[in-house]
């Protein structure tokens, strides 16, 4: 029986690893997955913490892939490269500031929007936004004003960070929200995609620390079995993220986000239909 639980962890890790970086909402897909696949004898407190902390596996992949670029202490970097790295971290910090003011409301958002209908609506809304922005930019022949991450202005970093706040709504997608913000502000797909990867580092570590704190504060303790299931899911999320990040980085160099927009609309519509049918079954 415990083997089945491990297989579930592997499945959740695969879902997290793919959907955390593709702009299709990891939280939304995990909510959907839990509708049909659930751990046995695990309470709501554990699952709430699990759905957030599993993201640490995904963010570790970013730190591994971009370690050289993110590490200001690399011996082979000259002074100019070191300053460039610190400027990148400053931009990440600036973009994270808007979230600090709303983190305390995460429980409220979970209580009121952690459901399939809300997820479906957010999937559709941002799917439409992706398609609209891509069509608008093509119709107007709008060329991105920021094509290199080094030249991303601090004000633009903050502007993109404002869109991260919208990701508190399940189904939005943190990467999806920041990509929309970047496209609206004239940032190229490649730059906003890479910057989105980096933004996940403080956000996911902060969100995980907050969830663990609340979990412990509520008097909950992780059993060995729960810890093992969580670590398995994180490990799988890390491995799958290594592939997903490289895929998306390559994909956006030649394609736009229209395909992801269409996927979101189709999935959101299916979830709305499912929610409607479930009312009468």
Curated annotation (Swiss-Prot):
Classify the protein's membrane topology as the record does. Answer: Multi-pass membrane protein
Q: Return one Gene Ontology term, BP aspect.
A: peptidoglycan metabolic process
Q: What class of enzyme is it?
A: hydrolase
Identification of the protein by name? Undecaprenyl-diphosphatase
The membrane spanning regions, by residue number, are 4-24, 45-65, 89-109, 113-133, 152-172, 190-210, 225-245, 257-277
NCBIfam families, alphabetized? PRK00281.1-5 (NF001391)
Q: What is its EC number?
A: 3.6.1.27
Cysteine disulfide partners in this protein = none
**Stated role:** Catalyzes the dephosphorylation of undecaprenyl diphosphate (UPP). Confers resistance to bacitracin.
Q: Which GO terms describe its cellular component?
A: plasma membrane
Recite the UniProt keywords alphabetically: Antibiotic resistance, Cell membrane, Cell shape, Cell wall biogenesis/degradation, Hydrolase, Membrane, Peptidoglycan synthesis, Transmembrane, Transmembrane helix
Family statement drawn from the similarity comment of this UniProt entry: Belongs to the UppP family.
Keyword Amino-acid biosynthesis in the entry? The reply is: no
Note whether Cell wall biogenesis/degradation occurs among the keywords.
yes
GO MF terms, alphabetically ordered: undecaprenyl-diphosphatase activity
| Superkingdom per UniProt | Bacteria
**Miscellaneous section:** Bacitracin is thought to be involved in the inhibition of peptidoglycan synthesis by sequestering undecaprenyl diphosphate, thereby reducing the pool of lipid carrier available.
Catalytic activity, reaction form: di-trans,octa-cis-undecaprenyl diphosphate + H2O = di-trans,octa-cis-undecaprenyl phosphate + phosphate + H(+)
* HAMAP family per UniProt: Undec_diphosphatase (MF_01006)
Q: Where in the cell is it found?
A: Cell membrane
